[in-house]
Amino acid sequence: ADSVIGEGGQGYAVLERTIDEGIMAVGSEAVGCMEKLYKETVEYCRQREQFGQAIGKFQVLQHRMVDMFMEHEQSKSLMFMAAMRMDEGYGPEAQKAISAFKVQIGKSGKFVGQNAVQLHGGMGMTEELSIGHYFKRLTIIDTLFGNADFHLKRFGAL
């Protein structure tokens, strides 16, 4: 009994909060990765020419870049909401916000990463560009601390 840290039977609650703080940390990293992917893709589309003009002038690609921007902004908004809920006090509302944030970064990270790679063409996954690195990192972050199914169930149970 002298070796017990904290109160007996409270281990899971402490662990759950620690995991949620970890989600906030890697989730914030994911938002930064998405922002970098979006900005590098926009810049690349301004420079890369096809058929005598920058590919960023093609409407279809403009729409994709807007969709990338919106996915990033949705993730960033949920990040701020989850951080505010944590700041108000850790409890069910903070847990719900964190689970919603985790689901969103998984969805948005995949979308932004795949589109960044595709719009960069074959260069997207080479070691010369950071695009592939950020996409791989987003893929790993999606698997950390529970996938979308886990967090959707958790959200519903709260």
PLM region spans:
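Alpha-helical interface subdomain recognition
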Residues: V4, G8-L158
